[in-house]
From Swiss-Prot:
Induction: Expression is induced during host plant infection. It comes from Phytophthora infestans (strain T30-4) (Potato late blight agent). Effector that enhances P.infestans colonization of Nicotiana benthamiana leaves. Keywords: Host cytoplasm, Host nucleus, Secreted, Signal, Virulence. This is RxLR effector protein PITG_12737. One of its GO terms (cellular component) is host cell nucleus.
């Protein structure tokens, strides 16, 4: 009997506490929504009646160059991150100038074709001199050309092997 009475009292306390909390939340929500409406109404009332809508400014905001210089300095603008600026500068210095000077992908394609033609002439010239892939490999190992790195020599041998397989 005592346990039942304790459970009933505990349940009543929980229910009254939860209803009190929910009513407090509802009261706060009503107060907040009323103040938000008041703020909206006061901001609308502060504007002239004829021009309630806000409009974006026109693209051209100044008449002369001097006004434009002043306007551009005074106006807040989005700043480019320093990392991005450094990256663009490095790109321009390293190899971007070559890409920026080209006008189209067709020009790059023509350049690539010219390079392929030159390399094809060089490979056919090696064949005319009597080199096979094995003899070329031995010749490079025995007397490497001046200024040629090992990676370049390996690449030349690889290209000549492919050329030999295609044309023989």
């Amino acid at each position: 009997m005592r346990a039942c009475a304790i459970l009933v009292v505990a349940a009543a306390a929980v229910l009254t506490g939860s209803t009190a909390i929910s009513s407090t939340d509802a009261l706060e929500l009503a107060t907040l929504s009323k103040t938000a409406q008041d703020v909206e109404l006061s901001s609308v009332a502060a504007q002239p009646r004829s021009n309630i809508q806000r409009r974006l400014r026109k693209h051209k905001t100044v008449n002369t160059n001097s006004e434009m210089e002043y306007e551009s300095e005074a106006e807040a603008r989005g700043l480019v991150p320093e990392k991005l600026t450094n990256l663009v500068n490095k790109f321009k210095k390293v190899g971007g100038e070559v890409m920026l000077k080209t006008k189209s992908l067709n020009q790059l394609k023509k350049l690539s074709e010219k390079m392929e033609e030159k390399s094809l002439y060089a490979l056919t010239d090696l064949e005319k001199k009597g080199y096979t892939p094995e003899t070329l490999r031995d010749a490079i190992k025995n007397t490497p050309p001046k200024g040629m790195k090992d990676a370049d020599a390996d690449e030349l041998i690889k290209f000549y092997d492919e050329y030999w397989k295609i044309f023989h």
